[in-house]
Amino acid sequence: MTSGKVLSLYMTMPDMMRSGHRMKVEDIECDANGIIGSRDYENDTERPMVLVSKKSYDIIEEAELFFERGLLMEDIYVDVDLYHLKKGSIIEIGDMIFEVTGACEDYRYLYAFAPELPELIKGNRGLFITPIEYGRIEVGDEVNVIKEA
């Protein structure tokens, strides 16, 4: 069984604060409406969360590019490579259970940071995950693969 730890968590701030600003947080709580307190909470659209592995930033840094964590729009940043997981795989993080819904393959905005960045991390951009059991995640929580599809 693959396991690791949560290195950092991010949330997109709501309109009343700094709309669209990505903020590093120590914990997040989720329910059926999404990440409590985020801009997209209760917006009636399906918003999967983005999980990014340290592997993505390692690839970027090996190419001598250096960016702050959070650039890849991750909600959850972990130390374990989970990019082998397919749609339908199940991951436990903190109190929560997630289903992998697919690979995150949106690279368009990354061209603004470095033209080579999208090609560099192709296939290693992140995973879309959807909560199926709700609760809380904190930095340092364990990440465990429960089932591989």
Language-model segments: what does each one mean?
Residues 97-102, 119-131:
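Active-site scaffold segments
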Residues 85, 91-92, 136-138, 143:
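Short, well-ordered loop/turn sites that connect or cap secondary structure elements
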Residues 106-107:
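Short, surface-exposed beta-strand-loop junctions and turns on beta-sheet-rich folds
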Residues 38-41, 130, 139:
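Short, electropositive, low-hydrophobicity segments enriched in small/polar residues
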Residues 63-75, 111-126:
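Short, basic/aromatic beta-hairpin or loop at an interaction surface
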Residues 79-81, 130-134:
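A structural micro-motif recognizing beta-strand termini
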Residues 133-136, 148-149:
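A short, acidic, flexible beta-alpha connecting loop/helix-capping segment that sits on the rim
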Residues 1-103, 148:
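Electropositive, beta-rich accessory/interaction domains or terminal extensions
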